[in-house]
Amino acid sequence: MPTSRAMEITESQPIGGNVSDFELLPVSGSAPQGLTSILANKKGAVIVFWSAVCSHCRRYDDYLQKFSMRYPDLGLGVIGAREKENAEVLTKAIADRSLRFPILHDINLKVAHAWLVCQTPRAFLINADQHLLYRGAIDNFKYPMDPEYAPYLDHALEDFLSGQAVRRSETPGFGCPTESVYYHRN
């Protein structure tokens, strides 16, 4: 059973409810950005918690690179959120992988904690009023040619952009932990 604090936090982020705003520095060193600026003049936004060293995140580099072309009416915020993943590691990944999407750095995982993120990648769809419409995986970690492939986030985006309610508003996550876990034997 979750602690009462965990239950309080979970209840503060219901689907359809408001998500907390944030302001983080981009890895590039430019001016701070937050949810409000990502949503500016957009119908909504996708926020993806991401890690430079997570192999699951690496798989979605191309998806994130093409996102703005595929969904020009939506903002995109990619948040580097992994314990002890410093700006140097993020900058190296950007250069080595020729990443063109901006990455915001959640240095102390404050935004990840506020948004209940414990693994990367984790995607959120938010409308222009900062209401949470979808949270979960980008897909079911199968490749598009697999008959069982399910592009969860794309389906949510299609529903939202066509003016329909998002049919599947939450999916289970998978990926790399944002924080180290140590097991101690006594």
Predicted regions, residues:
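Short, thiol/selenol-centered motifs that function as redox-active sites or metal-ligating centers
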Residues: S51-D61, E83-K84, A123, F174-Y183
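Residue-level signal for well-ordered, solvent-exposed loop/turn and beta-edge residues enriched
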Residues: G17, S30-A31, K110, H131, ...
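N-terminal "domain-start" segment that seeds a small globular fold
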Residues: P2-S37
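Short, small/polar residue-rich loop motifs at catalytic or cofactor-binding pockets
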Residues: N18, K43, C118-T120
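Short, internal strand/loop/helix patches
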Residues: A93-N127, L132-L133
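Short active-site neighborhood of thiol/selenol oxidoreductases, capturing the structured segment around
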Residues: L35-R59, L64, L157
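Structural microenvironment flanking redox-active thiols in thiol-disulfide oxidoreductases
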Residues: R58-R97, I107-A114
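Thiol-/selenol-based redox modules, centered on thioredoxin-like
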Residues: N127-A128, L132-N186
